[in-house]
């Protein structure tokens, strides 16, 4: 599964062995894997993730994932 972290999320990844600082990486999709599991595995605080995209479709944190999926995680964006 392809995972992409946007904006400041790559620097927020704190899990040991995570791809800290990398915006794109691959993880193995296992049976029953949901978006929330991936967020936990890479160590990104779930409250930092505002938008979840799976294969170009906006989904929630409890969406099931499969091998070959493309997961994009986006933080809230602000500015003026």
Q: Where are the regions that the model predicts?
A:
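Ubiquitin-like/PB1-type beta-grasp interaction modules and other compact soluble beta-rich domains
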Residues: 1-79
